[in-house]
């Protein structure tokens, strides 16, 4: 029952998580919708069993009864007897989003859960759009937090913001090379830098590979951030630190993930599409791309000659303190 439907539920797919929804509740909702779809499928024909039933003797006018072998359907597998065929599914969740954040969230069903581990090991970058609001600071870096101070921002310009973003990107790119454990003078490091495939080989602090301002209309501004090993709270703190470098203050009003590895907004299923058929189609559509990208990253990893690492490479400081290290260059 539903074996064909279950066979197509093996792989990775992406959904769009709205703000205000916990990832755990999202996973439970998707699981319930999948179970509902699987159990609603037409069940196979029941098995036939031979039973001896009383019946009239054929060709006889006398009212005599005899036992006759008769094929009858077996009800042991009927859903009203056994209950629903599927009662739970194991669904894995990729790089998670906190309650306030929204955007692309990768989920896995069946053998796709092992592919999530491959995604983690590939250290793929993720894209975010982050909205900020100048002029105030709160205790949790969010607009709804407890107000700590209000500041003026008339002196803030787009050019000054762009300079600070350039400092952040430059410092994090240096840290990225360091955590990749590459020989900075080698041809390999140069070629990987040109291809844009330099990635850390182990755990590291949040690393930003790209950051730019998409929109600037004080007090509001919109940033695009490409990063890895981040949390959404770290991105909110980044907005706060940018405000300090601008000699004012800032809070984060939105964190939205637009890409997670090889899944983008176009791949993410909206809430109205969280059903069996849409998810099956999404898994089938993504499967060739997932296999190709993971194979590509595996080849890069095998071809990467990793140098010995002892703690933080070459005495590098935490790149989260980038602003303090090089703030003077943005002034």
From Swiss-Prot:
Belongs to the pseudouridine synthase TruB family. It comes from Mus musculus. This is Pseudouridylate synthase TRUB2, mitochondrial. Keywords: Isomerase, Mitochondrion, mRNA processing, Transit peptide, tRNA processing. Residues 309-331 are annotated as: Disordered. InterPro entries: PsdUridine_synth_cat_dom_sf (IPR020103), PsdUridine_synth_N (IPR002501), Trub2 (IPR039048). Residues 319-331 have a biased composition (Polar residues). Its EC number is 5.4.99.-, 5.4.99.25. The active site is at 98 (nucleophile). It catalyses: a uridine in mRNA = a pseudouridine in mRNA; uridine(55) in tRNA = pseudouridine(55) in tRNA.
């Amino acid at each position: 029952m539903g074996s064909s439907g279950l066979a197509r539920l093996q792989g990775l797919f992406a959904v769009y998580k709205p703000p205000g929804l916990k990832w755990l509740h999202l996973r439970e909702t998707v699981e319930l919708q999948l179970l509902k779809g699987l159990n609603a499928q037409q069940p196979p024909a029941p098995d036939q069993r031979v039973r001896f039933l009383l019946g009239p003797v054929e060709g006889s006018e006398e009212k005599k009864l005899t036992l006759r072998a008769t094929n009858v359907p077996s009800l042991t597998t009927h859903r009203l007897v056994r209950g629903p065929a599927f009662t739970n599914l194991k669904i894995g969740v990729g790089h998670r989003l906190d309650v306030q954040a929204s955007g692309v969230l990768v989920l896995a069903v069946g053998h796709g859960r092992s592919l999530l581990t491959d995604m983690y090991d590939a250290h793929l970058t993720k894209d975010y759009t982050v909205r900020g609001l100048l002029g105030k600071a709160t205790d949790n870096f969010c607009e709804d937090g407890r107000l700590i101070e209000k500041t003026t921002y008339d002196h803030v310009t787009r050019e000054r913001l762009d300079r600070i973003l350039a400092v952040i990107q430059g410092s994090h790119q240096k840290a990225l090379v360091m955590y990749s454990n590459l020989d900075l003078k080698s041809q390999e490091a140069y070629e990987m830098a040109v291809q844009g495939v330099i990635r850390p080989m182990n755990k590291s602090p949040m690393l930003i590979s790209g950051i730019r301002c998409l929109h600037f209309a004080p007090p509001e501004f919109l940033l695009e951030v490409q990063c890895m090993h981040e949390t959404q709270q770290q991105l909110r703190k980044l907005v706060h630190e940018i405000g300090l470098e601008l000699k004012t203050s800032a809070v984060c009003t939105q964190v939205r993930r637009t890409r997670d590895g090889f899944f983008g907004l176009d791949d993410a299923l909206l809430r109205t599409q969280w059903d069996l058929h849409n998810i099956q189609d999404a898994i089938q559509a993504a499967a060739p791309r997932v296999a190709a990208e993971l194979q590509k990253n595996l080849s890069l990893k095998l071809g990467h000659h990793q140098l010995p690492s002892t703690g933080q490479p070459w005495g590098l400081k935490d790149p989260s303190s980038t602003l303090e290290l090089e703030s003077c260059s943005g002034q």
